[in-house]
């Protein structure tokens, strides 16, 4: 330690004589001080990743929970739950019962309902968070009624967007007592949602022109919260959530191939429970 301090003192004196580094205030012989406090001395922080993240959205815009993907290829575990749940107090469709959504999503949905009402439309919440066990029961019941055929109307357990706590079914007043089908898209309320939901951080999870990708029938009532920046990007580029993740994964692959820090992106990579 003494030898190190002698070398440091010599270096500082040399720098002072050369006019490169102004001498700090008098320092007691045994006083410890931080080199980074001395003008002209740069200490590299090993935690800083010098590699640039090359994607339209910054890493700070990408919340791993909010962009969580749930489908047949990317199954959620039977124990997966949103980080927080809020009991919904919005206008509900008859028979909907008690409903919950992930807390940030719940707040955003309340704002969307208010925006719709301001535009002259009254919306009803029909379905929200759904646990794995509940989804399993619904899926098996659908198979029984359909002679064992998966017709794309009810997701298999682990593949349901509702399990994320970020997916919800929102219907117009004229449909609050009816069975849901794609004809609902023609209502002014659903047209308003399709045009404006991104402003509140939502996207139409299962668009009409993406059924071959999502493998789910068109659901104009199914909103999915992803956050405002991601929703705006998806809306502007005409994507479904699967296509968004395809683009995001390509950016992640390029970043890692160039030597990027895996710790910065590992939570954004989608994995399946099976």
Question: What kind of region is each of these model predictions?
Answer:
Residues 3-4, 196:
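Residue-level recognition of alpha-helix termini/interfacial anchor residues
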Residues 4-26:
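Sec-dependent N-terminal signal peptides of Gram-positive bacterial secreted proteins and lipoproteins
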